Amino acid sequence: MTAGSPEECGEVRRSPEGRVSRLGRRLGRRRRPRSPPEPLRVRARLRLRSPSGAFAALGALVVLVGMGIAVAGYWPHRAGAPGSRAANASSPQMSELRREGRGGGRAHGPHERLRLLGPVIMGVGLFVFICANTLLYENRDLETRRLRQGVLRAQALRPPDGPGWDCALLPSPGPRSPRAVGCAEPEIWDPSPRRGTSPVPSVRSLRSEPANPRLGLPALLNSYPLKGPGLPPPWGPRTQTGHVIITVQPSGSCIEHSKSLDLGLGELLLGAPAARDCAHRSWPRLDRLSLGGYAKLGGGGDLGARV
């Protein structure tokens, strides 16, 4: 068992490897790159009930008629009866004249005319059929292009699928949450100023609504819950006159540095929110800074003289 096992195992191992390699090569040779599928498989039908279809049918009919004429010209006909030949062969002169007449008839007989006329009629019918068929396919291709353009326009005008396709019109209020792909998240009005930023409120979300111009500013203000110390609701009785005024009652002295913003939407005044901590502002105030250091530098004299 130990002596014959290596050779047998070697033979057993080689055979499946060889088979697998051959199968792999065969499969690799048989594989061919497939052409990508067409994005729009929209194709119009052939308009057979049209002038071009009628001419195509007429051409096919003419081809069949010419073919029948040619077959009739080449069809073998029987010769005359033997009794008539014996009666007509009594006079040698009449026989000679008839032979001459037969020779001329063979050259210009009805069978020869049919043989010449049949192919000509077939050619004319084939020409008409080819021209009409070409017009049929050209009309079908033109209609197919129009259908594809209509489908592309419909796909371009159709809103994207999903529950949040209208999020660009009325953004949902509240904190930021994962939204649908392709929907712009509205900016949240944070009353507390950040470091390196201006305390002026961001109004980008109020003016970035070009999709639906009918939605006025009251609808946008109603969609955003504006919360702050002493902030009255914007939907109070003051909105009945058509003017929306938003004011913020400050708790400190930082409100005097803010300025009103004119958005071009009537009389709209947006006061800057009160800052909780006035130590981190985007611009320094000279009246708030201690000018002691500047006085020391000014009254110290020349530094070179001291040295």
Curated annotation (Swiss-Prot):
List UniProt keywords, sorted A-Z: Glycoprotein, Membrane, Transmembrane, Transmembrane helix
> Which segments carry the region annotation Disordered?
1-38, 81-111, 180-211
Intracellular or extracellular location(s): Membrane
Claim: Transmembrane is one of the keywords in the record? yes
Where do the record's glycosylation annotations fall on this chain? N88
Query: What is the protein's membrane topology class?
Result: Multi-pass membrane protein
Compositionally skewed regions (Basic and acidic residues) per UniProt? 10-20, 96-111
The family line of this record is: Belongs to the TMEM200 family.
What is this protein's name? Transmembrane protein 200B
Q: Which organism is it from?
A: Homo sapiens (Human)
Its gene? TMEM200B
